[in-house]
Amino acid sequence: MAARRIADEPAYVLHSYDWSDSSLILETFTRHYGRVALVAKGAKKPTSNFRPVLLPLQPLRVTYTLGGEGHGEIHALKGAEWAGGHVMPTGDALLSGLYLNELLLRLLAREDTHAPLFDTYAGVVRVLATVDHEGEHGDALEPVLRSFELLLLREIGLLPGLDAETSTLAPLHAAARYALVPEAGLRPALSADRAALSGGQWLALQGALDEPARYTATLRAIATAEAPVAADLKTQLRALLQYHCGSPLLRTRQLMMDLQKL
């Protein structure tokens, strides 16, 4: 029986590692099939057509056959083409993109479809590609990253509702302060909390997440808030993400901390 073939599938390479002297295992994020592991035979050879194409943060179209008996979740890459559209991000934008890739690797189950999240990721990568070494458009990075973190957590069911206290379901008061903490969800802020947002800010974020075009709406809510929310939101979302990722610390986050970029 012929192996099932998946053709012309939109995809991004999240990570790659050696499989043999000449081949690679690719962890990819595909639009219709989620996170998929592919073996790219001969990809390390200088003459391989795969070699210049299988790069992170680049839109691809891949063709592969499903792994047969004994191959489990690893499938055979048969073709890959650059889908075009933008250049490779650099500098802080590149590190940010690799951070998003690590989140997807740590939090997404293999072959669990997340088409809306794929579209959000593709949009974020396009923004990252516009940030140059001198930091042009760099002010867009924070809202974009925070939006993706929120949407990722929501997509995989790890984000509590942002319109009520998690433990009591009491509605939020617009002027009160609330903190999002890993063990308890959203609760009234304490003096010891490193970061918190007002009830009105959390409600605005929940409203954006409920919009049909949730990525655009969430990005707008963060970027245009009357009081800056990105910094306090970063502290809370990073703690929640690390809690669900478990140990060790995210490698890209540690690298950015070492470079004093976080």
Swiss-Prot record:
Keywords from UniProt, A to Z, are: DNA damage, DNA recombination, DNA repair
Q: What's an example GO BP annotation here?
A: DNA recombination
Question: Matching InterPro entries, A to Z?
Answer: DNA_rep/recomb_RecO_N, NA-bd_OB-fold, RecO, RecO_C
One term under GO cellular component: bacterial nucleoid
Q: Which Gene3D superfamilies match?
A: Nucleic acid-binding proteins, Recombination protein O, C-terminal domain
Kindly indicate where the leader peptide sits in this chain.
Answer: none
Entry annotated with the keyword DNA damage = yes
Pfam families listed in its UniProt record = RecO_C (PF02565), RecO_N (PF11967)
Stated family: Belongs to the RecO family.
Q: What does this protein do?
A: Involved in DNA repair and RecF pathway recombination.
Please state what the protein is called: DNA repair protein RecO
The record lists the organism as Acidovorax ebreus (strain TPSY)
